[in-house]
Amino acid sequence: MTTNDTWFTEHFQTTGSAIGFRVTGKLDEVQSPFQKIEIYNSTDWGKLMVIDGALMLTSRDNFLYHEMISHPALFTHTAPKCVVIIGGGDCGTLREVLKHPDIEQVTQCDIDEQVTRMAEKHFPELCTSNNDPRATLLFSDGVAYMADCPTNSVDVIIVDSTDPVGPAKGLFNRTFYESCFRALKNDGLLIQQSESPLALLELIKEMRHEMSKAGFKAFKTLPFPQPCYPTGWWSVTLSSKQPNANFAFRQTDAQTKPFDTLYYNAHLHHGVLVPPPFIAHALGE
């Protein structure tokens, strides 16, 4: 990462590329016990949240990520009631999950309370569901939380984490996935952010391999645009305990959903289930 008076620029060694945003200044900064969190104001993308030098979200395009990490799983499950979010400290995913009126309980567990406090201060539009009576916000280690989670108690687990380094590294291995597998009901689903399919397909393959070793039987990686992330293209990976899962979704419910979205809809969901040939070939689909 480099900054000067007018630009925030992030360099990506894994992709040999960089992305920059014109900024008017730094609005806030806090060093938590886990990471450094900064907030910048940009000229065209609203506010930026940066963690340890890596851009996490912008006001302008965060809806893409938050909608795609939540609604595909919730409309694929036949009747989700109990949801766990691991990570998700900016609370945008929590907001999207609680748009579903039949959700009864959401527990969000993020290791760093300061991420949520900075989001509440600078991105209040993401935090509108923080006081929903169905929501419980915990600030502790997500790996430990899932290890202690009761067996067969959760319908959908959403892993809304940073990249697989630092505090989030433990969210990408077999031990964590075994905890998720045990906590999910038989028809439960796991969905996790899975980086750029254009640049990091090997990481996605390794994730799916670790999930498979933990017992998951079927997988579907869903790509979507994300301009502020490396390559401008991101993905989430959906996993099922059922060997014959085809990830059919409740299309009528998605078409008649009683809430607004900016990106997700039933037609898009149908299309994203058909991967581009290069992804299908690499992942053996």
Curated annotation (Swiss-Prot):
Binding, spermidine: H66, D90, D160, S161, T162, D163
Annotated S-methyl-5'-thioadenosine binding sites: Q35, D110, D141, G142, P167
Domain PABS: 5-241
Main location: cytoplasm
Keyword Transport: no
One of the GO BP terms on file: spermidine biosynthetic process
InterPro entries to which the protein is assigned, alphabetical: PABS, PABS_CS, SAM-dependent_MTases_sf, Spermi_synthase, Spermidine_synt_N, Spermidine_synt_N_sf
Domain of life: Bacteria
Active site (catalytic residues): D160 (proton acceptor)
Enzyme Commission (EC) number: 2.5.1.16
Compartments where found: Cytoplasm
Catalytic activity of the protein: S-adenosyl 3-(methylsulfanyl)propylamine + putrescine = S-methyl-5'-thioadenosine + spermidine + H(+)
GO cellular component, one term: cytosol
Purpose: Catalyzes the irreversible transfer of a propylamine group from the amino donor S-adenosylmethioninamine (decarboxy-AdoMet) to putrescine (1,4-diaminobutane) to yield spermidine.
Family: Belongs to the spermidine/spermine synthase family.
Name this polypeptide is given: Polyamine aminopropyltransferase
Chain's gene name: speE
